[in-house]
Amino acid sequence: MKFYLVLAFLTLCAVAVTALPAGDETRIDLETLEEDLRLVDGAQVTGELKRDKRVTCNIGEWVCVAHCNSKSKKSGYCSRGVCYCTN
C-alpha cells in the first residue's frame, strides 16, 4: 500500500514539473497568434454561413426518434433533413 502511495506521489511530481511554463518561446508564439488574429477581419470571411438545425436526420430517422424520446416526446419524424418531435 505504501508503494502505491509513493508511486502516485512521484507521478504527481513528474506531471507538475512537466507542466511548468517553457519560457519565452510560448510568449513569442502567443504574440504571433495575437497578430494573426488582428489580421482576420469579419469582412474577409467569404461564403455563405449555413447552420443545420438537426444533424440527426442525416444519420437516420431512428436517431431523430431517439432524440425526441429523450425529450419525453412520443415520437419524431424527418422532413427535409429537419427532425420534428410529436406529442
Swiss-Prot record:
Single GO BP term: antibacterial humoral response
Residue ranges the record assigns to the propeptide: 20-44
InterPro entries listed in its UniProt record: Defensin_invertebrate/fungal, Scorpion_toxin-like_sf
Induction: By bacterial infection.
Localization in the cell: Secreted
Any single Pfam family the record assigns to this protein: Defensin_2
Organism lineage: Eukaryota, Metazoa, Ecdysozoa, Arthropoda, Hexapoda
Family according to the record: Belongs to the invertebrate defensin family. Type 1 subfamily.
Keywords noted in UniProt: Antibiotic, Antimicrobial, Defensin, Disulfide bond, Immunity, Innate immunity, Secreted, Signal
Position of the signal peptide: 1-19
Gene3D superfamilies referenced in this protein's UniProt entry, alphabetically: Knottin, scorpion toxin-like
Protein name per UniProt: Defensin-A
Species assigned in the record: Glossina morsitans morsitans
